[in-house]
């Protein structure tokens, strides 16, 4: 049956998809969450706390929560650390927006990183239409094209990381 990814695995997967990294205090840059030596790093990572990285008060793996919660959904939708990963100047969305590849190739790259598969024809069509559609700001004024493409790729990364296929082992 499908099970949600463990907190550390999900954080590393989000970093892979977003093309970013999470730095932890007193550890070398690029240390992955799955390699954290102990639970003291939970306090510096709201993501790990919200997604249930155990405090290791016992040796039982049963201490780890696997249920989904409203706070987890809200964290993926609104949290500053997630928004920062999406908007990173060196992140995947920014790199894809600047890339000379065809839009279809860029979207295939996102799907391969997120799901280890190419998008279905329907998924590809929907994503391409979204990326190339004219974007407007809250007042209805057109957004500058480079910014619109960058924000469209940020939205696609965000949408993919919020799917069941991304968050769950099957």
What are these regions (language model features)?
Residues 156:
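Globin-like tetrapyrrole-binding proteins
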Residues 1-118, 160-170:
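An acidic, gly/pro-interrupted, aromatic-rich
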Residues 81, 135-138:
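Structural motif corresponding to the C-terminal cap of alpha-helices
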Residues 125-136:
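Amphipathic alpha-helical segments that form the core helices of the histone-fold
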Residues 9, 123-126:
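Ca2+-coordinating acidic residues in Ca2+-binding motifs
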Residues 137-145:
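Intrinsically disordered, low-complexity Ser/Thr- and acidic-rich flexible linkers and loops
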